[in-house]
């Protein structure tokens, strides 16, 4: 079994540098607009490359990837980070069979909240076994700012990367023991993960049970 153990967010909406512990069953409790859904957005984006952030309770919010990176506030065109911003999401896993950790991460670089992202602005990373969040330099130790692309690598060990969302989905599915993203199980993983974290209504629950469960 592969378990999500910790999640790290750098410059993701109102989270500037936080690390969450995760368990097999994790509750996220809080008042509205405290950031629960943005955490789910981060997990979904990191593991599936899906940028559809508008969940059932926030259809009018118009949440976007750039909005999360630049920390869009409730006011129109109000952002906590209006200029060039780099964000990181890191998910640390534990493989119970191999008895080792590994990390899946994504880096986003955006020039501004209204600027369209370029193909090279998103980079997904998958570490080799034995890497934890602490072994990856999410922040530049000299400046405290998010690390540059060329500096985001462990001191010991390797880190593969891709800027292609489709290639990232394929590599992530393989790292999680699912196989290719285009396989029947890979397709179901991406579909069900979206359903399970978006809070969208399931139109036909019986069909959902028969098809996915």
What do these predicted ranges mean?
Residues 21, 36, 82-84, 202:
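Active-site-proximal structural scaffolding
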Residues 143-213:
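Extended, Lys/Glu-rich alpha-helical coiled-coil stalks
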Residues 17, 77-78, 194-197:
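Generic recognition of flexible, low-complexity loop/linker segments
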Residues 45-57:
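Post-Walker A helix-loop "phosphate-sensing" segment adjacent to the P-loop in P-loop NTPases
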Residues 48, 88-90, 99, 190, ...:
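N-terminal membrane-targeting/anchoring modules of bacterial envelope and secretion proteins
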Residues 1-48:
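Pre-Walker A-like glycine/lysine-rich segment at the N-terminus of P-loop NTPase domains
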Residues 58, 93, 194-195:
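A short hydrophobic beta-strand->loop->alpha-helix junction that borders the nucleotide-binding pocket
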């Amino acid at each position: 079994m592969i378990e999500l153990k910790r999640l790290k967010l750098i410059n993701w909406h109102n989270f500037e540098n936080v690390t969450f512990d995760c368990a097999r069953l994790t509750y996220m409790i809080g008042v509205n607009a405290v950031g629960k859904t943005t955490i789910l957005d981060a997990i979904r984006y990191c593991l599936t490359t899906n940028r559809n952030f508008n969940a059932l309770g926030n259809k009018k919010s118009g949440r976007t990837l750039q909005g999360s990176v630049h920390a869009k506030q409730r006011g129109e065109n109000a952002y906590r980070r209006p200029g060039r911003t780099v964000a990181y999401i890191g998910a640390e896993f534990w493989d119970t069979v191999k008895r080792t950790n590994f990390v899946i991460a994504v880096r986003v670089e955006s020039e501004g909240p209204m600027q369209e992202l370029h193909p090279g602005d998103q980079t997904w990373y998958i570490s080799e076994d034995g890497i934890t969040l602490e072994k990856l330099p999410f922040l530049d130790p000299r400046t405290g700012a998010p690390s540059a692309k060329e500096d985001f690598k462990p001191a010991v060990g390797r880190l593969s990367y891709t800027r292609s969302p489709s290639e990232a989905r394929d590599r992530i599915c393989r790292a999680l023991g699912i196989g290719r993203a285009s396989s029947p199980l890979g397709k179901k993983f991406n579909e069900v993960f979206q359903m399970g974290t978006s809070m969208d209504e399931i139109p036909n629950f019986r069909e959902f049970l028969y098809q996915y469960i």
